[in-house]
């Protein structure tokens, strides 16, 4: 109730700093052309997200800590994949990687690197069954940042995965095709399980969290197609879902604010 009536959230220490760092991380992921810098910006975004979630209260701290532990595993796998690519090619520049990785497309190291990227980004983007952090994170996130986090936190890793699959890796390679097939299967499972779990929830934000698991499944299926139509579909759905999910969180916040102000006995 203090959040919607007294605007106490505006005075929470570190809120604007964390929000600014989150924006910096997202912007850096877009403009960078280096896979290690991408890791740095991804972690700036993630650490800021952990902090914004933790500002929401006691339950938020537990949700943020759980997200931190799981997210660190995803980041470590991504960094391990970067290490394998560097060992094979001797460069971290994306344009150079795309050219130098070609002779190694059938090597075991490349297969391990692809697996690390798929699992690492899968954790970060809450792909089923690696979505365990998302329901609590969305439900207990700081109300002043929940809409932004819901719209961007899982889409940014999806964007990074798109850059790897379509720009650095070759989608016609058997190793990459096998990884994309697994990604597609997980996407279908995520759509089914996420939708069923969303319909079973009584908390609006938790329902939207499981709905996001299903929507990430659609993006994964677009990626798994490995062609231009799948690429266009994945990008359009990622943009659409970012705006749609943020808007739904804002709508829910508006309803809660209205009922708290109009109905004194209403509990948010």
Segments predicted by a language model, with ranges:
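Hydrophobic transmembrane alpha-helices and their helix-loop junctions in integral membrane proteins
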Residues: 1-6, 23-36, 48-268
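Mid-membrane cores of alpha-helical transmembrane segments in multi-pass membrane proteins
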Residues: 18-21
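Short phosphate-coordinating micro-motif centered on Lys-Gly-acidic
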Residues: 43
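Membrane-interfacial loop-to-transmembrane alpha-helix junctions, especially the N-terminal start
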Residues: 10-15
